[in-house]
Amino acid sequence: MNKQKRLRLFCLLTAILLLSVSSSSLAAEAPVQPKPTLTLIGHASVKIKTADGVVIYIDPYYPGDYSEEADIILVSHEHSDHNKVNLCKQKADCVVLRVSDTINKKDVTYNTFDVKGVAIQPVPAANKNHKIDSSTGFVLTFDGIKVYHAGDTSKLTQMADLQALSIDYALFPIDGKYNMNAAEAMACAVLAGARHNTPMHYFEADPAGFTPENLLLIPYGDTVELEKAAE
């Protein structure tokens, strides 16, 4: 091989090496997209954080960490174990939605909201202790994921409508005090048809009594990463 060919080969190999190093460096520096998370603080108190960092608290009450400033606070009804909004640190533009915002009492229709990329759809929640015009559940849509928080409720025929929404994560009260017990909650899980079913609002009740298909048991205080359904 003459000197000129060796020089060309050297230059080619050098270029390939530099390109490889540059590509590896770019791959290493590419930011990792955070995953959305859900924390079951306790009772019916839930914290959701979207991939973009939007912080949502639902039914704040149970002792826990509310220190991350809220973008959105949702109150399903005004019982004292669901409405402790003052526990949450709030951003200056925090949106607080209570029953007076979400339900039109005259005809029991529901107002929907889109806040910071989170679609908020109130849905029926009721039983003998919670009037249909004074209580809601919520379906939240963000990052291609749907989360259903049932609020305080018993089984309702309207829950069958949730199947059409393709719920990814559903949370059901199970203690049987002012709402349904675990057996009735399992029937609700069948109606809703979510990919994951989680018990909440169980006080001294044993969450092990809630055994639906697709059970996702989240101990109080724990956080899980939320995943989109496989396409």
Where are the regions that the model predicts?
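Bacterial N-terminal signal peptides
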Residues: 11-21
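Structural motif
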Residues: 74, 147-149, 171, 198
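Di-metal (Zn2+ and/or Mg2+/Mn2+) metal-binding site signature of metallo-dependent hydrolases
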Residues: 62-102
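Cap/insert and terminal regions of metallo-dependent hydrolase folds
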Residues: 154-231
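Bacterial N-terminal signal peptides that target proteins for export
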Residues: 2-12
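Sec/Tat signal peptide C-region and signal peptidase I cleavage site
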Residues: 23-27
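A short helix->loop->beta-strand "cap" motif at the edges of active sites that frequently abuts
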Residues: 54, 90-96, 193-196
